[in-house]
């Protein structure tokens, strides 16, 4: 503790002192609440809602609302909030992190701010670390909320959309971070707004906040799917375009860096693939593959734009001539080049949507958290989430004795000493909880105890219900429990009869974790609510932490002392050396998380733009103005690309290319000629093209009707946006992986990622406009309402290695080609003897 803290108290001390008058006010309202009948107490909720609707703030209502909740808890649950718990509740309401020691009743504390914030009617989310705790807390605390006239719901794996929607529409919703995050992503993939399940993210309390916002922050949530692209279609499209003839079947626009089918080429495609209208929106996928195959074969040049290296396609940087490691062409072009060059076409599971917890939780209007251990990570909470940490005083003084670490030369010596200590302690009847850093080490220690005939239970974080049951008995006389550090977290260990007389629960740590916070959590399992207890860590110089980060000075001391295998040293210098090693690791991990957030923030801004655009489409906003703006942008950009800053000698050729390019997208063939337009200015040409396009679009709308046209616009925009966004996610991922491999002289990799990622995003937005306009002008207008379809089906939702497979198989839109059917490439051979040969 620094001199300032000694004189003025710590930050937490000062904050608690500032909050104390509010606690006094809540206390003073107690007698008044006790006089109310059950019905009168419940009516208070409706009174608060009415006052809130009339403009009174939640802060103003806090003392009275907390007093109501406290009295209801006493009646329904038989538990009255202590003053310290009221302090914790106020801190949580203020959108901060409350550090409360194990056994101080965090679950009960949360009821106070949850009740108060539920009055706003915008939904309160309570996040727990597993489904078991979410269900337990909902059923347990739900009694209190329902008594007060509020509804509760729980989100667990396996619910239907309707069940999820009902749970989210409740005043208070419990669930895990994974479930809430995945539902957010799925809501931004729906094709009808009625399919959404979540409401806007309002107020959230994260239990075990350090575990969720720090330990799990590095691994993103990913929803994956088979996508609509299969590698065989790239090969078939490649085979088809290789037979085409330049000028007759396709033309090359060098300025636009593109190749397009002529009318004859379109007819060839319709014949080869057995379709009536190549330009129909239902053939979007086929058009995409053929367009990219044309570009790969006739625009992209080997050893200029790319090289074939180790049977892979490597992009050549057009400015430096160097290979751009890790970078792939976007929009399926890379796969098209792979098909062209006969190397393996990379088949990847498509990322349909992804987000990190860091960015998901920062979307809440107000975020709060509670845990037994947060102070060591206070800097990270403040820098990344804007949350400060307030340490809440314990109801009773902590009586647990934390003994100095014992350091052994070898792991064998350490484990022998641990087994000996467990046996000696067991003779007294004192319960022992042994914390390990991995399942493997738990099982190793268990095998040593079995050899000695010592009865014990092993707990690994696999079965949450069973976990809670075993942990709840870990404090009974004579019980020995071995657990990985995180196992059973969230369940209190209550001491059995006669345990205090033998010294309370003894904690043995088998090695120091790389984070001091995890060590503190293990210690905190003992000494709850002022109980007696003991804790000690056993360490060897062969432990991972000591081996990788331990100081050479400590190793030298041990060597100088000439310790035997079973001998240990115990000193303040040793403990300080270990803490310094932990601080090194913590600092390193924080830097990694901050760097990843720097990358993800780029993607996050792009995600917000796309999701907002999708939402506007779904909400039924009039899209007519947006479509007209897209038409203007596509024409204006095309005119600028072809006719801006060119030599007079090239003007007529470029004008001809421009007309062909826009005829392919929206203008009627033969409507404009070079002869007619060559004397016009660029502005006049642009105006004529726009007027013509608008007239055609107006005629199309008059034919089909405005309502039908708006739905066609919705269907096509959703389909194009989703297709392009999924490809863009992949492209950004490849960019992130490759950017670290490239040498940027005096350039920050994150800055480079921001710049390139921004350029890629702008390109994607431009491609969305071009494709949307193309499909709208070529769509085959029918009397029946167009059907919205998902671009890709979800096949899995994963956070790190935790994959939740969805049983439904992805539905592919394209008709399946039988092995004995004619090959759709148009060769006249059977599929199995042609393009089907290489398809696995």
Curated annotation (Swiss-Prot):
GO cellular component, one term: cell envelope Sec protein transport complex
Catalysed reactions listed for this entry: ATP + H2O + cellular proteinSide 1 = ADP + phosphate + cellular proteinSide 2
Keyword terms of this UniProt record: ATP-binding, Cell membrane, Cytoplasm, Membrane, Metal-binding, Nucleotide-binding, Protein transport, Translocase, Translocation, Transport, Zinc
Bias (Basic and acidic residues): 802-819
Enzyme class: translocase
EC number from the UniProt entry: 7.4.2.8
Annotated positions binding ATP: 85, 103-107, 492
GO biological process, one term: protein targeting
Main subcellular location: membrane
GO MF terms held by the record: ATP binding; metal ion binding; protein-exporting ATPase activity
Cofactor details (free text): May bind 1 zinc ion per subunit.
Matching InterPro entries: Helicase_ATP-bd, Helicase_C-like, P-loop_NTPase, SEC_C_motif, SecA, SecA_CS, SecA_DEAD, SecA_motor_DEAD
Signal peptide: none
Complex and partners: Monomer and homodimer. Part of the essential Sec protein translocation apparatus which comprises SecA, SecYEG and auxiliary proteins SecDF. Other proteins may also be involved.
Biological function: Part of the Sec protein translocase complex. Interacts with the SecYEG preprotein conducting channel. Has a central role in coupling the hydrolysis of ATP to the transfer of proteins into and across the cell membrane, serving as an ATP-driven molecular motor driving the stepwise translocation of polypeptide chains across the membrane.
Recorded family membership: Belongs to the SecA family.
Name the record gives this protein: Protein translocase subunit SecA
Native organism: Clostridium perfringens (strain SM101 / Type A)
């Amino acid at each position: 503790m620094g001199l300032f803290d000694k004189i003025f108290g710590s930050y937490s001390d000062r904050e608690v002192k500032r909050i104390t008058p509010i606690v006094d006010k809540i206390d003073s309202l107690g007698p008044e609440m006790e006089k109310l009948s059950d019905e009168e107490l419940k009516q208070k909720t409706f009174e608060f809602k009415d006052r809130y609707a009339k403009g009174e703030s939640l802060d103003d209502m806090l003392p009275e609302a907390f007093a109501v909740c406290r009295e209801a808890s006493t009646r329904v649950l038989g538990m009255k909030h202590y003053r310290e718990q009221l302090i914790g509740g106020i801190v949580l309401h203020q959108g901060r992190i409350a550090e409360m020691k194990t056994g101080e009743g965090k679950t009960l504390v949360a009821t106070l701010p949850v009740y108060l914030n539920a009055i706003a009617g915008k939904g309160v989310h309570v996040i727990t670390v597993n489904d078991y705790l979410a269900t337990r807390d909902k059923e347990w605390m739900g009694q209190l909320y329902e008594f007060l006239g509020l509804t509760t719901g729980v989100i667990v794996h396996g619910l239907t959309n309707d069940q999820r929607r009902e749970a989210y529409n409740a005043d208070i919703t419990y669930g895990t971070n994974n479930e809430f995050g995945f539902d957010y992503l799925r809501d931004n993939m729906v094709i009808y707004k009625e399919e959404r399940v979540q409401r806007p993210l309002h107020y959230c309390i994260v239990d075990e906040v350090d575990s969720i916002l720090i330990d799990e922050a590095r691994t993103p949530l990913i929803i994956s799917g088979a996508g609509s692209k299969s590698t065989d279609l790239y090969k078939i499209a490649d085979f088809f375009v290789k037979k085409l003839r330049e000028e007759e079947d396709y033309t090359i626009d060098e300025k636009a860096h593109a190749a397009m089918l002529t009318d004859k080429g379109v007819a060839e495609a319709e014949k080869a693939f057995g379709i009536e209208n190549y330009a129909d929106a239902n053939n979007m996928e086929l058009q995409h593959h053929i367009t990219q195959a044309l570009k790969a074969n006739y625009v992209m040049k080997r050893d200029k734009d790319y090289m074939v290296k180790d049977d892979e396609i490597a992009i050549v940087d057009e400015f430096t001539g160097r290979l751009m490691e890790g970078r792939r062409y976007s929009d399926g072009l890379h796969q098209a080049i792979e098909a062209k060059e006969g190397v393996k076409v990379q088949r990847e599971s498509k990322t349909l949507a992804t987000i990190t917890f860091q960015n998901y939780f920062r979307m809440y209007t107000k975020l709060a958290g509670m845990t037994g251990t947060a102070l060591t990570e206070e800097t990270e909470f403040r820098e990344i989430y804007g949350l400060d940490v307030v340490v809440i005083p314990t109801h009773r003084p902590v009586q647990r004795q934390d003994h100095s670490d014992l350091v052994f030369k070898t792991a064998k010596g350490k484990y022998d000493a641990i087994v000996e200590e467990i046996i000696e302690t067991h003779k007294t009847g004192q319960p022992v909880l042994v914390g390990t850093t991995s399942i493997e080490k738990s099982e190793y220690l268990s095998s040593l105890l079995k050899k000695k005939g010592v009865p014990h239970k092993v707990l690994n974080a696999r079965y949450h219900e069973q976990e809670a049951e075993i942990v709840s008995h870990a404090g009974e006389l004579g019980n020995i429990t071995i657990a990985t550090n995180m196992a059973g977290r969230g369940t209190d260990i209550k001491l059995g009869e006669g345990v205090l007389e033998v010294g309370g629960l003894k904690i043995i740590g088998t090695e120091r974790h790389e984070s001091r916070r995890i060590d503190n959590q293990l210690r905190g399992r003992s000494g709850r609510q002022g109980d007696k207890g003991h804790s000690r860590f056993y360490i060897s110089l062969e432990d991972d932490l000591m081996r990788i980060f331990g100081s050479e000075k400590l190793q030298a001391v041990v060597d100088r002392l000439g310790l035997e295998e079973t001998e240990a040293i115990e000193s303040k210098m040793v403990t300080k050396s270990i803490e310094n090693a932990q601080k090194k690791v913590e600092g390193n991990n924080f830097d990694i998380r901050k760097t990843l957030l720097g990358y993800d923030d780029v993607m996050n801004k792009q995600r917000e733009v796309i999701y907002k655009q999708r939402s506007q489409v779904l909400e039924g906003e009039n899209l007519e103005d947006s479509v007209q703006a897209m038409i203007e942008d596509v024409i204006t950009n095309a005119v600028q690309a072809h006719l801006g800053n060119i030599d007079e000698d090239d003007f007529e050729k470029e004008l001809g290319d421009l007309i062909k390019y826009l005829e392919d997208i929206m203008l009627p063939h033969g409507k404009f000629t070079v002869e007619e337009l060559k004397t016009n200015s660029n502005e006049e040409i642009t105006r004529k093209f726009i007027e013509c396009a608008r007239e055609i679009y107006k005629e199309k709308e008059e034919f089909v009707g405005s309502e039908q046209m708006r739905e066609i616009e919705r269907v096509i925009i959703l389909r194009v946006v989703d297709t392009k966004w999924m490809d863009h996610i992949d492209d950004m991922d490849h960019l992130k992986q490759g950017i670290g491999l490239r040498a940027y002289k005096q350039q920050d990799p994150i800055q480079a990622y921001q710049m390139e990622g921004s350029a890629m995003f702008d390109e994607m937005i431009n491609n969305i406009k071009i494709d949307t306009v193309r499909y709208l002008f070529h769509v085959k207008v029918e009397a029946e309402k167009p059907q919205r379809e998902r671009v890709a089906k979800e096949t899995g939702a994963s956070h790190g290695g935790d994959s939740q497979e969805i049983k439904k198989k992805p539905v592919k839109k394209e008709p399946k080609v039988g092995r004995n059917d004619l090959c759709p490439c148009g060769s006249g051979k059977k599929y199995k003897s042609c393009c089907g040969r290489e398809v696995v």
